[in-house]
Design a protein with these regions (language model features):
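Hard-cation-handling environments
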Residues: 158-237, 241
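Glycine-biased, low-complexity coil/linker segments
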Residues: 367-369
Length: 372
């Protein structure tokens, strides 16, 4: 734990409970129960149960209440509106990660810090795009903080998914696409060509679709697999969105001779598709890729950067080589984007974070890889 003098010099410090703002006496995305928590978004590694008070963006209310309970003590803010707590001015700004995701801007004593949470720099239409917020100190993730990670453009990605779905529909087999139920599933729904066929979703996905629709995000009509209208003929033309936990489960038997695929940033790596046991892999992430991380950090104008999780040491070294004061915060954030990095961690940290920011265990030699 930092000394009192160190805490005086920092607006955010790492404590056993989470990232703590000493002058404001509150935490940002704490992983242990605290009195006051500012939540950047509703993924379970950032929004934990048990806090006495939550502050989040208004569009996170639906997902937070769905995941943590209808009666959680939740205060919400729109983007850009500031409140003051113990002399710290706090405001939330778009992070572009999932619905309601926010960067937390802190202003106190002439200093400005921004804690970004998780973010993505390419707009996807399901949430306001990432907004660079000028600051002195920026706290960044680094989930995909290696030069190998470069995402295809949104239009290219969905052309690939549509072509795969269309070919399967013409062959009379369902297209099962495994993806995370919150964020990625809705992004896929928003981006695919719904004229190709019906869209069926797992029961874990549909409640979150309702939250997105209530927030005004345009999603095509969806059916649940157990709806009366869903029969064998319909399924032969359908796109089916399901969480990774459904793979190999009895729930999958209803689809007969189906084609399957997995949507994840980890599909950039050699061997991931094979290990997942699917026919196709689509390189898709709700986190920034390597160029996106560089763009976001540069856009803040910050002279000091703290890196929280992912390829921490690689990012810290690169930032230092480029003239910034770069340090690491050790955290317990996981990776909602995919569970590939959490094998054996056991603490909610990614394997990268648990190993002090070492590259993904499946990273090919010399940083080379291939998209499946």
């Amino acid at each position: 734990m930092p000394s009192a003098k160190q805490e005086e010099d920092l607006l955010v410090v790492a404590r056993p409970e989470g990232l703590y703002c000493p002058p404001g006496d509150f935490y940002i995305d704490p992983w242990r129960p605290v009195a006051r928590a500012v939540i950047t978004h509703a993924h379970s590694d950032h929004a934990r149960p048990g806090h006495a008070h939550y502050l989040a963006h208004v569009d996170s209310a639906g997902t937070l209440r769905a995941r943590l309970g209808r009666d959680i003590p939740l205060q919400t803010l729109p983007y850009g509106e500031a409140i003051e707590h113990h002399g710290v001015r706090v405001s939330l700004h778009p992070a572009g990660h999932v619905l309601g995701s926010a960067q937390v801007r802190l202003e106190h004593g002439g200093r400005v810090w921004v804690a970004s949470g998780d973010y993505k720099t390419e707009p996807d239409g399901t949430c306001p795009p990432f907004e660079p917020v000028p600051c002195d100190t920026f706290i960044t993730e680094s989930t995909f903080g290696l030069p190998i990670y470069r995402w295809p453009a949104q239009a290219v990605l969905f052309a690939q998914i549509d072509a795969w779905w269309r070919a399967n529909a013409e062959a009379g087999r369902a297209s099962v696409l495994f993806c995370y139920a919150f964020g990625k599933a809705q992004r896929i729904l928003h981006g695919v060509d719904a004229s190709i066929g019906p869209i069926v979703v797992h029961g874990a996905v549909e409640p979150l679709n309702a939250v997105y629709r209530a927030a005004g995000v345009a999603l095509p009509p969806t059916l649940r697999a157990d709806d009366a209208d869903v029969d064998a003929a319909l399924l032969k033309r359908a796109l089916v969105l399901a969480p990774p936990s459904a793979q190999g489960s009895p729930w999958m038997r209803r689809f007969g001779n189906y084609a399957d695929a997995f949507a994840s940033g980890w599909m950039q790596l050699r061997g991931t598709r094979r290990r997942r046991g699917v026919d196709r892999g689509f390189v898709m992430s709700d986190h920034a890729d390597w160029p996106g991380l560089q763009q976001a950090i540069a856009g803040t104008g910050a002279e000091r950067v703290f890196v929280t999780h992912g390829s921490v040491q690689v990012m810290v070294r690169w930032l230092g080589e480029n003239g910034l004061d770069a340090q690491a915060f050790r955290t317990e954030y996981g990776d909602e984007d995919d569970q590939e990095t959490s094998r054996g961690s056991g603490s909610g940290q990614t394997a990268c974070d648990a190993d002090a920011g070492s590259p993904h265990p499946d990273l090919p030699p010399a940083g080379e890889g291939e998209a499946p």
